[in-house]
UniProtKB/Swiss-Prot annotation:
Pathway: Metabolic intermediate biosynthesis; 1-deoxy-D-xylulose 5-phosphate biosynthesis; 1-deoxy-D-xylulose 5-phosphate from D-glyceraldehyde 3-phosphate and pyruvate: step 1/1. One of its GO terms (molecular function) is 1-deoxy-D-xylulose-5-phosphate synthase activity. Pfam families: DXP_synthase_N (PF13292), Transket_pyr (PF02779), Transketolase_C (PF02780). This is 1-deoxy-D-xylulose-5-phosphate synthase. It is an enzyme of class 2 (transferase). The keyword Magnesium applies. The gene is dxs. Catalyzes the acyloin condensation reaction between C atoms 2 and 3 of pyruvate and glyceraldehyde 3-phosphate to yield 1-deoxy-D-xylulose-5-phosphate (DXP).
Length: 636
């Protein structure tokens, strides 16, 4: 790691020669494999942007020239080159480096949301701020993947960026989708190089003016030459990806040729106006196990063997795999069931459905808003769409759920993977807002399964509902031990336990506590119940299964107990506890009620168990909180 050890700031890159740069790129790839193999993370994307990121920091002066990484899962090399290499052993660990850009870590990090398609809007706003401050020298750079360009927000931003002819916005498209070739013959290479020569712009503008001043003949000549140029351009530039926005375009550029990368970025740096630089890169570059992973190119990994790329521990069947299997079974029985993903068929478990029913599967790209409204259209056409997305990405499509699905009472089922606390992926990947958001949609029904069997049951129930939208939410990770209900009430609420108080003369005289456990929180609720009964209270534990709207039996049960506690994995405002409190108030039930939920804040990254413990949401923390309530309410 000779060259890498000498890099502590981006300025250290500027004096390196070609040989040093090649050596540095190799060292960075070795470093990435070694460190990410030990912690897990986004390996493939970062292996693909080594030369690109080196070039960005050689040409631009960060942070004076802001560099914004869309999604920012591909910012590891950026972190290495901005003085954080020494901290990579803590990547995605508690109190360690974030897996995304993080403003608290470095002045070189401008944003920290890991949601796609937002970088160009940030860049548009930053460039406007610089213009208002009279700064005409510095550029704003946005690095966006070809996948993110399937998001409508990118094109909204590009439309505004293109309108700012005197704003220095550099849009670097990191095209690793293998859709376009970086080299299309020698003529294409020469044309791409020609377009980056300063005299080319002057010549084209002067020639255009001269020809048009020659009257009819000049006009026809210009049109013919322009048509020829555009015809040639269309063989080089993927015009279906980059429509005529009125912005300067450079590329395609071989994103692994350092000299070509630097030249293109230098041209963009010196260009007075918005410009698109199209870099073609290879995800997983330089690491054989990633290059051979044709499906994912090691986009994201857990802890792996750095030599083979094999996981260090075998993964257990999780929530997603159960959903995947059950949906295929449902699809085989009901040909009107269709599935929609927003560019995440594998992570959300829809690949198996796609393999079995390719004509009933739709990948809409990174476009959650479109996914939900398209689902409404499918429902209007007599189908029952199942939209599988991560809980955190539902935030982007709330208006579509509220107005396009909910208002029309369409039978669309949203399956929200990674609900609740997700942990190491950081604040913006937690799925803690979905209950608060979905619960305000009139007519929506929301289910929260506690284990494998209830997930299968609730998914079937949701898809059988044909008069309005349904939501099924479940967390990330392994499945808990199955919990068998000891009783089921008329409205479907499962009773999981009756725990009699211990160390009391008569349980009839002991205060009674009702614990309402949401989804997989049933496991910890049963643990807590077995503990607090030793403090002289009788405990009933129930699982509502369908949490929105609040089942009427929960109101009756609350009226029959001396204290009601809700335990959930969403934010405290607007969740099940809030909904229950509203229902009790409406029925004039004055039983004291308390909530165990996620605080109203953005959670730092750590493992899921660490986050739960930090906020008192594990069994120990909940027991301590509940015992305090018992003492204040029933203590002598």
């Amino acid at each position: 790691m000779g060259i890498l050890n000498s890099i502590s700031t981006p300025a250290d890159l500027k004096a390196l020669n070609d040989e040093d740069l090649d050596a540095l790129a190799k060292e960075i790839r070795t470093f990435l494999v070694d460190k990410v193999a030990a912690t897990g993370g986004h390996l493939g994307p970062n292996l693909g942007v080594v030369e690109l990121t080196i070039g960005l920091h050689r040409v631009f002066d960060s942070p004076q020239d802001p560099i914004i990484f869309d999604t920012s899962h591909q910012s590891y090399v950026h972190k290495i080159l901005t003085g954080r290499a020494k901290d990579f052993d803590s990547l995605r660990q508690k109190d360690g480096l974030s897996g995304y850009t993080c403003r608290a870590e470095s002045e070189h990090d401008w944003t920290e949301s890991s949601h796609a398609s937002a970088a160009l809007s940030y860049a548009d706003g930053l460039s406007k701020a610089k213009q208002l401050d009279g700064d005409t020298t510095h550029s704003v750079v946005a690095v966006v993947g070809d996948g993110a360009l399937t998001g409508g927000m990118c094109w909204e931003a590009l439309n505004n960026i293109a309108a700012g002819k005197d704003r220095k916005v550099v849009v670097v498209v990191n095209d690793n989708g293998r859709s376009y070739s970086p080299t299309i013959g020698g003529f294409a290479e020469n044309l791409a190089g020609l377009r980056m020569q300063p005299f080319y712009d002057r010549f084209m503008e002067k020639g255009k003016t001269s020809l048009k001043s020659m009257g009819w003949v000049g006009e026809r000549t210009f049109e013919a030459l322009h048509a020829f140029k555009e015809g040639v351009k269309s063989t080089v530039i993927p015009t279906e990806m980059f429509p005529e926005l009125g912005m300067k375009y450079v590329g395609p550029v071989d994103g692994h040729n350092q000299k070509a990368v630097d030249n293109a970025l230098k041209y963009a740096h010196d260009y007075d106006g918005p410009i698109i630089v199209h870099m073609v890169t290879e995800k997983g570059r330089g690491y054989a196990p990633a290059e051979q992973d044709l499906d994912e190119l090691m986009h994201s990994t857990g802890v792996i063997d750095p030599l083979t790329g094999a996981p260090k521990s075998a993964s257990k069947p999780g929530w997603t795999s159960v959903f995947s299997d059950e949906l295929v079974k449902i699809g085989a029985q009901n040909e009107n069931v269709v599935a929609i993903t927003a560019a995440m068929a594998g992570p959300t478990g829809l690949s198996k459905f796609e393999a079995n029913f390719p004509n009933r599967f739709f990948d809409v790209g990174i476009a959650e808003q479109h996914a939900v409204t398209s689902a409404a259209g499918l429902a209007l056409g007599g189908k029952h769409p199942v939209v599988a997305i991560y809980s955190t990405f539902l935030n982007r499509a709330f208006d579509q759920l509220l107005m396009d699905v909910g208002m029309l009472n369409q039978p669309v089922t949203l399956v929200l993977d990674r609900s609740g606390v997700t942990g190491s992926d950081g604040a913006s990947h937690n799925g803690v807002w979905d209950m608060a958001l979905t619960s305000i949609v009139p007519g929506v029904q929301v289910a929260a399964p506690r284990d494998e069997d209830s997930l299968r049951e609730l998914l079937n129930e949701a898809i059988s509902i044909d008069d309005g939208p349904t939501v099924v939410r479940f967390p990330k990770g392994d499945l808990p031990t199955p919990i068998v209900a000891i009783d089921t009430l008329e409205d479907g609420v499962d009773v999981l336990a009756y725990e009699d108080a211990t160390d009391v003369e008569s349980t009839d005289d002991a205060p009674s506590v009702l614990i309402i456990a949401v989804g997989e929180r049933a496991t910890v609720a049963l643990d807590v119940a077995s503990r607090i009964k030793q403090h002289g209270v009788n405990v009933t534990v129930v699982d509502p299964r369908w949490i929105v709207p609040i089942p009427q039996s929960l109101v009756a049960l609350s009226d029959d107990h001396d204290l009601v506690i809700t335990i959930e994995d969403g934010v405290i405002h607007g969740g099940v506890g809030s909904l229950l409190s509203d229902a009790l108030n409406a029925s004039e039930v004055d039983t004291p009620r308390r909530q165990i939920a996620v605080p109203q804040k953005y959670l730092d990254h750590a493992s899921r168990n660490e986050v739960l413990a930090d906020y008192g949401l594990d069994a120990d923390g909940i027991e301590t909180t509940v015992v305090g309530w018992l003492d204040s309410l029933f203590g002598e």
